[in-house]
Curated annotation (Swiss-Prot):
Gene3D superfamilies: Metalloproteases ('zincins'), catalytic domain. Belongs to the endoribonuclease YbeY family. It comes from the Bacteria. It is an enzyme of class 3 (hydrolase). Single strand-specific metallo-endoribonuclease involved in late-stage 70S ribosome quality control and in maturation of the 3' terminus of the 16S rRNA. This is Endoribonuclease YbeY.
Length: 155
C-alpha cells in the first residue's frame, strides 16, 4: 500500500497536547491509499480565529468549524499527486469531543478521515451521499480500532 506524503502545519497559539505527526499519518494512510496511489496532503491545525475566517470566506458561515477541506484541482494535462489541504480547528474538535462524549483522539481521527473523504470527492449534501460517506467513515474508523463515530445518531 502506498503512503501519503503529509505536510503538517501546527498553527495554534499552544500546540501542546495535539496528536503526534505519526497519528495524523496513520489516519491519512487508512483512507487515501484505498482510492489514490500517490498523494500529498497538508493538514493545518488552527485556532478558532483562522477557522472562522476561512469558513466565512469559503463557505459563507460566520463561525469556526471542525474541519475544512480544500481539494487541489490539477490543471488539465498535468499529473500531480497533490490531493489538497485539510484545516482542522483545535478548539472546535476538543469542544465537540467533550459535548459528544467521545474520546478526543477518536474525534481527531474522525476529522482526518472525514476531511480526507471530502478531498477524494465524497460529500454529504444529499441523503444518499451522506449515507455512503458515513458508511465509509464508519468502516475506516472501525478498521483503526475506534468506535463508529455516528453510533449516537443510530441509537
Amino acid at each position: 500500500m502506498s503512503q501519503v506524503i503529509l505536510d503538517l502545519q501546527l498553527a495554534c497559539e499552544d500546540n501542546s497536547g495535539l496528536p503526534e505527526e505519526s497519528q495524523f499519518q496513520t489516519w491519512l494512510n487508512a483512507v487515501i491509499p484505498q482510492f489514490q496511489e500517490e498523494s500529498e496532503v497538508t493538514i493545518r491545525v488552527v485556532d478558532t480565529a483562522e477557522s472562522h475566517s476561512l469558513n466565512l470566506t469559503y463557505r459563507g458561515k460566520d463561525k469556526p468549524t471542525n474541519v475544512l477541506s480544500f481539494p487541489f484541482e490539477v490543471p488539465p494535462g498535468m499529473e500531480m499527486s497533490l490531493l489538497g489541504d485539510l484545516v482542522i480547528c483545535r478548539q472546535v474538535v476538543e469542544k465537540e469531543a467533550q459535548e459528544q462524549g467521545k474520546p478526543l483522539e477518536a474525534h481527531w481521527a474522525h476529522m482526518v478521515v472525514h476531511g480526507s473523504l471530502h478531498l477524494l470527492g465524497y460529500d454529504h449534501i444529499e441523503d444518499d451521499e451522506a449515507e455512503e460517506m458515513e458508511a465509509l467513515e464508519t468502516e475506516i474508523m472501525l478498521a483503526l480500532d475506534y468506535e463508529d463515530p455516528y453510533i449516537a445518531e443510530k441509537e
